[in-house]
């Protein structure tokens, strides 16, 4: 009777000794993991199996102990990489590797048509309407709900693209308008004074604005003033003419003296509303002849200022550009 317990004790001691030896081997394998690359592969297989079993037990203990403290993670895996080192991989709680991949729903043409018509009518279909629509189309309510969510997202993206395209088009149009105004300003800038004046080949104004006939204009001004004085003088009967001289050379209906017809015709031909035109032209010509270069310089300066204002102003201020342009044109005319 005493021999059997001795054998049992020896067997238990041997089991305990084997467990202690395996633990020591496991500790030594963990301490010497830096030198595992120099050991043969046959020697590394046995500690790896022992470590995997102990690592699995440790993993279970960790998962059980940290389940309440760390609910965001559900699984910790110890793996050995290509270099032989042990690494720990923590998988998130939401990741389910065993779950099959969700299949993509394929709609028929009739289902898409009905869904699109309902979306054009109302972008949010809930409650009984969604249930009835899903029943009519032979779909689930989840499929109908997801389709409407995706359709609303697509519409928002399309609206964003359209607004961006409209902004680009408006900016392009504004840039073109600014460039057009700058081109007009460049074409209006003259090299000299004669480019600004209208081409008057004939007439008293053209002869006055051209510089070589200034002495003739002075003589014409004197003759015009004398003719106007003769027209205003009374006739031989001692009474003045009750009608003013007509414009365009037509003689007035009043009586004319011996020199009245000849005096009235030149006055009518060279006066505009009783104003002597040659004298006016003479004054204009004298001003132009006195400072033509100054006027051309001021015009060029105003046009350069106008171009600078177009460049510095925003493309979305048409009224301010119009006012600046009118002010510059008035300065140029003055």
UniProtKB/Swiss-Prot annotation:
- Keyword ATP-binding carried by entry: no
Look up the record and give one Gene Ontology term from the biological process aspect.
camera-type eye development
Q: Which UniProt keywords apply?
A: Developmental protein, Disease variant, DNA-binding, Homeobox, Microphthalmia, Nucleus, Transcription, Transcription regulation
Q: Which SMART domains match?
A: HOX
Keyword hit for Nucleus: yes
Q: Quote the InterPro entries the UniProt record gives.
A: EMX-VAX-Noto_Homeobox_TFs, HD, Homeobox_CS, Homeodomain-like_sf, HTH_motif
Record region (Disordered)? 1-41, 234-263, 314-334
Q: Where is the composition biased (Basic and acidic residues)?
A: 1-34, 323-334
* Cross-referenced SUPFAM superfamilies: Homeodomain-like
* Gene Ontology MF: a single term: DNA-binding transcription repressor activity, RNA polymerase II-specific
Q: Its biological function?
A: Transcription factor that may function in dorsoventral specification of the forebrain. Required for axon guidance and major tract formation in the developing forebrain. May contribute to the differentiation of the neuroretina, pigmented epithelium and optic stalk.
Q: Which family does it belong to?
A: Belongs to the EMX homeobox family.
Protein name per Swiss-Prot or TrEMBL? Ventral anterior homeobox 1
Recite the lineage of the species.
Eukaryota, Metazoa, Chordata, Craniata, Vertebrata
């Amino acid at each position: 009777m005493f021999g059997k317990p001795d054998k049992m004790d020896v067997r238990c001691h041997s089991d305990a000794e084997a467990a202690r030896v395996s633990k020591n081997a496991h500790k030594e394998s963990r301490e010497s993991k830096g030198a595992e690359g120099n050991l043969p592969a046959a020697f590394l297989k046995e500690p790896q199996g022992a470590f995997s079993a102990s690592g699995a037990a440790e993993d279970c203990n960790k998962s059980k102990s940290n389940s309440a403290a760390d609910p965001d993670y559900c699984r910790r895996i110890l793996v050995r990489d290509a270099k032989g080192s042990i690494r720990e991989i923590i998988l998130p709680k939401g990741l389910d590797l065993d779950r099959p991949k969700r299949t993509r729903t394929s709609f028929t043409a009739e289902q898409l048509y009905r869904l699109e018509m309902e979306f054009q009518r109302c972008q949010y279909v809930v409650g009984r309407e969604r249930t009835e629509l899903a029943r009519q189309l032979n779909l689930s309510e989840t499929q109908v709900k997801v389709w409407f969510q995706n359709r609303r997202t697509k519409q928002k993206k399309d609206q964003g693209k359209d607004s961006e395209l409209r902004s680009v088009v408006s900016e392009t149009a504004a840039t073109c308008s600014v460039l057009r105004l700058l081109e007009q300003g460049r074409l209006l800038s003259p090299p000299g004074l004669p480019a600004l004046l209208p081409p008057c080949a004939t007439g008293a104004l053209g002869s006055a604005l051209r510089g070589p006939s200034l002495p003739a204009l002075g003589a014409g001004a004197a003759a015009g003033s004398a003719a106007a004085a003769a027209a205003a003088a009374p006739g031989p009967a001692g009474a003045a003419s009750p009608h003013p001289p007509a414009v365009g050379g037509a003689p007035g209906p009043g009586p004319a003296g011996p020199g009245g017809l000849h005096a009235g015709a030149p006055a009518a031909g060279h006066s505009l509303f009783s104003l002597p035109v040659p004298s006016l032209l003479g004054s204009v010509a004298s001003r132009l002849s006195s400072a033509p270069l100054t006027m051309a310089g001021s015009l060029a300066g105003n046009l350069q200022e106008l171009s600078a204002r177009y460049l510095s102003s925003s493309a979305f201020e048409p009224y301010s550009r119009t006012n600046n342009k009118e002010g510059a044109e008035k300065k140029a005319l003055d």
